[in-house]
Amino acid sequence: MFQLPHKLDVYITNVCNLTCDQCNRFNNHDFRGWQRWSDYEAQYQQWANVIKIPAVTIMGGEPFLNPTLPDWVTGISKLFDVDVQILTNGTRFRQAGGLYDALLNVRSGQIKNHIAVSLHRSDQFEKLKEDILWFLKAPVEILTSTHENNHHNSDWCFRDSNDIVVNVYIKDHFHTAAIRPFTRIGQPMQKTYLLHNSDPFFAHQNCGFAIFKSYHFVHAKLYKCGPVALMPEFDQQHTLAISSQDRTLLNSYLPLTVDNFDQYHEEFFENLDKPIAQCKFCPTLETITVKKIFPLIKGQQHVL
């Protein structure tokens, strides 16, 4: 059994209902596709036989838009005997059928699955608060960031009568993403997408995925980060404006799988925290900017 020192991110959908500029997994664009738990359950069962994980975050996209989210929570919790955090933008609590029961029913021992909300606009907190209170079971305790019992260091911690927890974190700025959209002159409705052309060493040095060791399970395959997993899939849907040589490089990354684990896992983990050739497609410190998020709901014109 191989012990991973850090949590893993389990990515289950490209789909998001918001258009947050500079989303680092490109979900602000028309990025489609989601993963059904039953399609990957057997592979994750095999993973549970070879690795041990300290914690898991289920994310997207917007994971609440994956109709099998309760199955993911139940399945990952039971297979890996681990705490599961669900990372959401907080706009879909009233459409989360079956999720509360999944959070409640899979608990055993020290496992306490919970929800984390990345709140992109602090002026939306009161609306979010109403939705969270609707989702949880009264009475609900609300702790601020300075409360001694807020062990998650969140801006607000909601804990209900069944000890189900929703943490809210204000996240209203994003850094420059790998994919750069632009509109061709004379073709205002046709978007084209570019990647960066950086020194891989310097891109990796300032990469949030690398700094916070955000390793990703996508389609039951383990990747160094989200972009290296998702850029080829985005390219399939939108055809990035890159050279054939760069496209070959983009698709050359070898993830760790249950099938190649025995032959490849030592090399994979030994190099996991080192730059890879595909880092060239991400920004460096010189090209990174920080932008305040003003998310729109997709298909609507008003700010969230």
Residue ranges of predicted features:
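Conserved alpha-helical substructure of the radical SAM core
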Residues: 1-101
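Short catalytic/ligand-binding loop motif for oxyanion handling, primarily in non-cytosolic enzymes
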Residues: 30-31, 65-67, 94-95, 123-127, ...
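Short, surface-exposed linear patches
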Residues: 33-34, 44-45, 79-81, 95, ...
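Polar/charged alpha-helical tracts
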Residues: 38-45, 49, 78, 101-105, ...
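Generic structural signal of hydrophobic/aromatic residues within well-ordered alpha-helices
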Residues: 62, 128, 132, 250, ...
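Conserved AdoMet/S-adenosylmethionine-binding subsite of the radical SAM
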Residues: 66-213
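Accessory C-terminal segments flanking Radical SAM cores
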Residues: 183-304
